[in-house]
Amino acid sequence: MCVYIVAGLGNPGPSYDKTRHNVGQMVLDILSGGARFRRHKTNNFYLSLGDILLVKPDAYMNLSGPVIASLMKFHSVSDLLVLHDDIDLPLGTLRFKQGGGTAGHRGLRSISDCLGSDYARLRVGIGRPENNQSIEDFVLSNFSPVQTDIISRTIQLAAEAVLHLRDNGFVGVKQFIAQTKSPSRT
């Protein structure tokens, strides 16, 4: 029986796979251990890890709310953890947050419009653009080689944090993040 839905935000298609905006889905790829996600009639790709259902919405990030909401209804699950990029956190930083605003993140806004704002988030810091690059171009670009090393370690830690849902729920995730040193910026 599914107890938690863990949704990794990102955009669909191979051209977005390695972009900053897709770090939430990158965490799910680590958790899947190479297993293939299956398509669900609610426009999601999913993979069950027992009591945790990993979900990749098959919609652009700013349209992810309706597909996540329909899957939650289908499985009668009320506990949601959303994995997403955050430009307000330095590269390599992880933060757990229960409820709250969207900070301008369109994927979170879409989810909040459908479900309200009382859901958990695991924020993955991607840093801010430099050299007057627009935020849109920045989040849709790939990481540099140095940044890739940092974000790879961060994504691994985020995947480990998600597994703490099994034993201690959201408290376990929060405690793991608080006790873990985020990969340092170089």
Swiss-Prot record:
Cysteine disulfide partners in this protein: none
Site (Stabilizes the basic form of H active site to accept a proton): 85
Any single GO CC term annotated in Swiss-Prot or TrEMBL for this entry: cytoplasm
Gene (name only): pth
Reactions catalysed according to its record: an N-acyl-L-alpha-aminoacyl-tRNA + H2O = an N-acyl-L-amino acid + a tRNA + H(+)
Domain of life: Bacteria
GO molecular function: peptidyl-tRNA hydrolase activity; tRNA binding
The entry's keywords: Cytoplasm, Hydrolase, RNA-binding, tRNA-binding
Name used for this protein in its record: Peptidyl-tRNA hydrolase
Annotated site, Discriminates between blocked and unblocked aminoacyl-tRNA, chain positions: 11
Database matches in CDD domains: PTH (cd00462)
Organism (species): Tropheryma whipplei (strain TW08/27) (Whipple's bacillus)
SUPFAM superfamilies per UniProt: Peptidyl-tRNA hydrolase-like
